[in-house]
Amino acid sequence: MFIIFYLFLNTSNTDVVIQWHESVSLSWTDFRGSVESNTDAVAVTASGITFSFSVKELNDEYVSFEVKANAHFYPDKSWYNKEKGNDHILAHEQLHFDITELHVRKLRYEVSKLEISQNIKIELRHLHDAINFDLAQMQHAYDSQTENSINYEQQLLWSEHIKKELKKYRTFRSQ
């Protein structure tokens, strides 16, 4: 069994998305993309962080800024093999989405520590890039250590770890 995770950094405004919410879990009906035939993958989850910011200027100086960041799941880019998909694999896919939300929370936390400066745009872009890098690294480590969901023990450990981390950053959760 093999599962692929895709991280989407740039997507079109016309893409159908599901925003992460703690009371809503993914279901197989959310995976609407076409199954790839040249792979051993059972499922593909496409998720990513949408990020934008605005900076208010007064007398040629930045005086305030606002940031928006969300964890999104892309149904039309996500798919699963109907003959092989099961609850265990769906839970593995959900955790990919949860890891994306965790990194949104980390991004919001780091943004909360920033102070307005004339370099704020650069700081925000660098922070976003760093969080996306960390997100990709964690997603890769997750699939590697769980052997794409095959290793049940590691899957459980990862599930507990992400649950703990989400709780740690709960102040910065998506609404």
Predicted segments, located by residue:
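Bacterial Sec-dependent N-terminal signal peptides
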Residues: 1-18
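Mid-length scaffold segments of soluble, non-membrane domains
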Residues: 72-108
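Metalloprotease/metallohydrolase-associated module, dominated by Zn2+-dependent proteases
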Residues: 15-63, 73, 116-175
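Envelope-exposed proteins and targeting segments
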Residues: 65-69
